[in-house]
């Protein structure tokens, strides 16, 4: 086939002797203390009775930046009621980010495959799951603002997330 011959053989990689790795094999960490009580019930976490009336004042916060947190952690010097192991840390409510009666536009909040026909619940924004921070639409609804949510645009080339596929 080829009159020039074969390609030269490449030398093999030299075998490395086994040595001590650079990282430690075992890392000794202190063990966390075991739980003594069951976690608090869901209803206890959202009961507005952690701070006694008159024990604390509510700090004011500017709504200059919409990404700001809705709650500030409570100062350590504030006198609160008897704390047990089942009561979580209390938070001060902060002034609303969205004024009541204002309208908030959430662009691309609905999927491109979302359908709004008879029986659709397009006007219902569900609360955030436990342990998850609320999104902009949920914050606006919680503060009494109106919310307009638009559909995310989908096209043939970018595809959609409605479960379909394109055959090339």
From Swiss-Prot:
A motif (PPAY) lies at residues 39-42. One of its GO terms (cellular component) is nuclear body. Pfam families: DAZAP2 (PF11029). GO terms for biological process: positive regulation of RNA polymerase II regulatory region sequence-specific DNA binding; protein destabilization; stress granule assembly. It comes from the Eukaryota. Interacts with SOX6. Interacts with DAZ1 and DAZL. Interacts with IL17RB. May interact with FAM168B. Interacts with INCA1. Interacts with EIF4G1 and EIF4G2. Interacts (via PPAY motif) with NEDD4 (via WW domains). Interacts with transcription factor TCF4; the interaction results in localization of DAZAP2 to the nucleus. Interacts with transcription factors TCF7 and TCF7L1. Interacts with transcription factor LEF1. This is DAZ-associated protein 2.
